[in-house]
């Protein structure tokens, strides 16, 4: 019962923080990047449906991350937050036969909004940009690192509270599964940001095939990882 109350309190804190970030982005609303904003909104929503179940953890991972990071790097705070909100909402919709979990969706959307909002503010921080002008990629690396922490720590915390597992052990497991993906997406975002200056807002379309390939690879890898414990148990049972 105690862990249930703590989980409810934590979800409420994350949800309120997410709404505060969304409200703050509205107050700072600037001119919209119409075509770029709409294209990233649609592409990230489509990519959100390409998701894989994380083995051993109650969660999934989709290939929408680079498009959210691109929005954070190139668009306004409001636009980046909306892209993250829609993307996380679409990702939380279960596949056919599944049951929609509104509380889980609220938590996932709020976490993604917070992560995208903080990353966007870092990327557009004048002091950080001027202090790192000799290393142009440093703000992006810092923003992606913070995005990773803000996105994964709350997930690990809520799993720990609901399942009674050790927080650091869960977070370590999530990091082991997702950190290489975040690292790759940081590189992809850097490349696409540079390409956008040359070919325009259509640049993110170029990485759709790459993300599809990454999705297929992770799906295959995670399916094997999920089957390994069951196979080991079967071998152990056969040896007895």
Residue spans of the language-model regions?
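Short helix-perturbing small/polar motifs within transmembrane alpha-helices
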Residues: 1-60, 66-173, 177-219
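Membrane-proximal helical linkers
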Residues: 165-170, 222-240
């Amino acid at each position: 019962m105690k862990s249930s109350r703590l989980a409810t309190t934590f979800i409420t804190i994350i949800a309120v923080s997410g709404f505060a970030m969304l409200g703050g982005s509205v107050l700072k609303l600037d001119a919209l990047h119409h075509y770029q904003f709409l294209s990233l909104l649609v592409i990230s929503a489509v990519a959100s449906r390409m998701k894989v179940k994380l083995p051993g953890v109650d969660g999934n991972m989709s290939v929408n991350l680079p498009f959210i990071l691109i929005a954070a790097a190139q668009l306004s705070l409001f636009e980046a937050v909306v892209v993250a909100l829609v993307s996380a909402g679409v990702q939380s919709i279960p596949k056919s036969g599944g049951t929609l979990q509104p509380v889980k969706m609220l938590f996932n959307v709020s976490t993604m909004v917070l992560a995208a909002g903080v990353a966007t503010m870092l990327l557009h921080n004048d002091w950080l940009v001027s202090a790192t002008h000799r290393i142009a990629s440093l703000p992006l690396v810092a923003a992606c690192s913070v995005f990773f922490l803000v996105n994964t720590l709350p997930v690990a915390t809520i799993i720990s509270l609901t399942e009674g597992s050790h927080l650091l052990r869960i977070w370590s497991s999530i990091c082991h599964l997702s950190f290489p993906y975040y690292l790759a997406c940081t590189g992809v975002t850097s490349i696409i940001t540079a390409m956008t200056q040359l070919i325009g807002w259509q640049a993110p379309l170029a990485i759709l095939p790459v993300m599809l390939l990454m999705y297929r690879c992770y799906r295959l890898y995670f399916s094997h990882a999920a089957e390994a414990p069951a196979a080991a148990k079967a071998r152990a049972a056969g040896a007895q």
